[in-house]
Amino acid sequence: HQLKCLRLPRLLAQWDEDLKAAAQQRFSHARLLTHVVEHEYRQRCENARQQRLRRARIPEPWVLETYPFSRQPKLNKKAIQALYDSSSYLTQNQNIIWLGPTGIGKTGLATSFLTHAIHQGKSGRYILFAQLIAELYQAIADHTQAKVLKHYLSYDVLQIDELGYAEVEPAQVGLFFTLMQQRHKKKPTL
């Protein structure tokens, strides 16, 4: 089928319904074409968003709208909401560091910002600090540092969770510092 060959899956699945709607609403040819293209475009955007979410490897998707601010009364909800809503951390390539003891919701907040960026069309990645350090250490052993750095530099937003909970070798610190230095003021890191 030509639509399958052209990679128009939504159109292939909905063609009969689109024609029926066009007949009922007396669409012109131009209106039918506009209708079909708009729906295909929306479906592709949604598919791309879902794919970016999968690739980000977020263990538990959070959104700020469901974050339990009532459990953390010391948090400045208005400031956090303003930063989130304005997306200035994305447009100004700002890093956000969440500090505090275990269990107060740092991961949830950071993940909500990463998810928000992905919904806005950005690529992103969630990774535990220990996992990142292990990959960097392996890259040193394999002499693939440039490739690994390029990989993590490619993400529009990078969320590094549980920073400081793992012991680190001096060589690993150096490569981690290089990664952070190269991302600084170019792409946000959470």
Where are these predicted regions, by residue range?
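Interdomain "pre-motor" coupling segment immediately N-terminal to P-loop NTPase/helicase cores
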Residues: 8-60
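Extended interfacial segments that mediate partner engagement and assembly in macromolecular machines
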Residues: 44-99
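Conserved P-loop
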Residues: 75-154
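Loop/turn-to-beta-strand initiation segments
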Residues: 122-123, 154-157, 184-190
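Conserved P-loop NTPase "ATPase switch" module shared by AAA+ and STAND
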Residues: 151-168
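Conserved catalytic/switch belt of AAA+ P-loop NTPases
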Residues: 164-188
